[in-house]
Amino acid sequence: MHKFPWALAMLALFGASPARAAAPESAASEKPAPETPRSPDARRVIDWIAATGDNHGLPYAIVDKQAAHVFLFDARGKALADAPVLIGIAPGDDATPGVGKKSLAEIGPAEKTTPAGRFLAKFGLAAGKQRVLWVDYATSVAMHTIPKGNPKEKRRERMLSPTIDDNRITFGCINVPIAFYNRGLRPQFLKKGGYVYVLPDTKLLEAVFPPLHVQSYRKADASS
């Protein structure tokens, strides 16, 4: 399975542009940048949010775990930026009960999952007074840049690689490129927070987002 184009990942990580955010207008940049492909599940969730206003007037991000990618939208649903991500090393969509109270050394390999679901995310402080976007504070899942940590993990190289499987390396947190974090995520979420929709990698999409059942029925009725 392949990721999105290598060049896009390079731009997102090193900040040549704000993770595919718009560049200044010029004669050479009149053509709109091509959109990063979105998976069918990502498109379904994006369409559902747009149709129902599920974000309640707040910015939101879609984390597609199977594609190891995040898509950022403003409060009105305008696509702002997208970037590759690193996620929990263990497949799965549920956090282990009590995992948020454990130290990193106490978390077992099977517990290092990035839970799926809809989360009201807000900025706050983590260990070491690092400011992060808390996706699910109870389970200690946050969205932040790649930590210094252990260089043997090669997180930067994993984010740049053309494959998806090696993007599973974290304890459950969602690592994003610096440019995406500083120029996209933080300006949008800093004041009031926003919603983070984490798509599943083992469960059915409708099991994680039940309203999609209703959305499917409405589309079926409209086409009949």
Residue ranges: model-predicted function:
Residues 22-24, 112-224:
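Exported/periplasmic cell-wall-interacting domains
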Residues 21-32:
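Cleaved targeting-peptide boundary
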Residues 3, 16-18:
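A subset of N-terminal targeting peptides
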Residues 7-15:
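Bacterial N-terminal signal peptides
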Residues 1-7:
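Bacterial N-terminal signal peptides that target proteins for export
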Residues 31-32, 70, 183-184:
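Intrinsically disordered, low-complexity coil segments
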Residues 34-40:
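N-terminal targeting leaders of membrane proteins
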Residues 41-155:
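Gly/Pro-biased beta-strand-loop elements
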